[in-house]
Amino acid sequence: MKKIFKIARLELNILFYSPIAWLLVIIFGVQAGLTFTEILYAQETSQQLERPLQVLSKVLFAGDNGLFKAVQDTLYLYIPLLTMGLLSRETSSGSIKLLLSSPVKISEIVFGKFLSIVIYSFLLIVVLTLYVVAAHFSIEALDVQFVIGGLLGLFLLACAYAAIGLFMSSLTSYQVVAAISTLAVLAGLNFIGQIGQDYDLVRDITYWVSISG
């Protein structure tokens, strides 16, 4: 376990030494903030027009235009940029030979690099949690359990994306190729649920294959 944590820490250091990791956190936070404020503004407008209001917790976080749905629809765009160099960088630089010849198991290398992206994914969830805290002080009866379940679901989805990205990174020595191939696979798994909806058999198959639900 110590070797896994050391590899994860080293990978996180490499990740945060580059501007990509910080830039993605900022973009992710701004995107979530814009979605959050737009929903609140729409609800305030509906209240002023005396329109019937729905349960604010679900509208704010889980509606068709909710915060969690917006994050789910765009999360696959972030992960390829994070995972593209996990193993392809080692292969292109030749350091993979040193890793394989060192007293470290291949499974420890894989788990260590995967753990680094899991930790980064948790950081993105922490950013979303800030908006949940803001909603907690703005909404009288926020459905906390419902919101926590949504955060957990997004975290697990990010971990699944990370596993796919790590696998694609192991197939090539070019980071750009790894990023593009990961993006293609994740996009396919996200949009495959829209294929063949007029046919029961195809609809059932694409529903189960679709990673975004």
Residue spans for each PLM region:
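Alpha-helix N-cap/start motif
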Residues: 106-107, 175
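Secretory targeting signals
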Residues: 34-37, 54-73, 112-175
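Hydrophobic/aromatic residues in alpha-helical transmembrane segments
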Residues: 79-83, 131, 163-164, 188
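Transmembrane helix boundary and interhelical loop/hinge segments in multi-pass membrane proteins
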Residues: 81-100, 114
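Pore- or pathway-lining transmembrane helices of multi-pass membrane proteins that form conduits
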Residues: 20-28, 175-190
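Terminal transmembrane helical anchor/hairpin motif
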Residues: 39-62, 181-213
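Hydrophobic alpha-helical transmembrane segments
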Residues: 1-78, 82-85
